[in-house]
Amino acid sequence: FGSGGVFRITMQNLNDRLASYLDKVRALEQANGELEVKIRDWYQKIVLQIDNARTKFETEQALRVLDELTLARKNHEEEISALRADTERQNQEYQQLMDIKLEQEIATYR
């Protein structure tokens, strides 16, 4: 072979190894790109899940507040109804007393 043949074989060997390394680098870069896409997709999915959980929590809170307000409104309506009934009763008593007073005044003048 001679020194030129050994040099050429060594260079060919180094070129083959370099080509192999470059192929590995390209494959790793491609795999890295695919992983980045998967990570980005996973992150977006998690963000959506968090947003959905937040929305669900806020909706549940709003429904709780709505239930509390509905109950409070019902209680107020019952109180108003009781007050109306009491007012009507007092009005009737007042009217009866006024009728009695009127009858007494008429009786006084007879």
Curated annotation (Swiss-Prot):
GO BP field: epithelial cell differentiation; intermediate filament organization
Name the UniProt record assigns to this protein: Keratin, type I cytoskeletal 19
Necessary for interaction with PNN: annotated span: 85-110
Residues the record lists as Omega-N-methylarginine modifications: 8
Chain spans, region Coil 1A: 9-42
Other noteworthy facts: There are two types of cytoskeletal and microfibrillar keratin: I (acidic; 40-55 kDa) and II (neutral to basic; 56-70 kDa).
Modified residues (Phosphoserine): 3
Domain IF rod: 7-110
SUPFAM superfamilies cross-referenced by the UniProt entry: Intermediate filament protein, coiled coil region
Keywords, alphabetical: Coiled coil, Intermediate filament, Keratin, Methylation, Phosphoprotein
Region listing for Linker 1, in residue ranges: 43-45
Chain's role: Involved in the organization of myofibers. Together with KRT8, helps to link the contractile apparatus to dystrophin at the costameres of striated muscle.
Family: Belongs to the intermediate filament family.
GO cellular component terms, semicolon-separated: intermediate filament
Organism: Mesocricetus auratus (Golden hamster)
Source domain of life: Eukaryota
InterPro entries per record: IF_rod_dom, Keratin_I
Region (Coil 2): 85-110
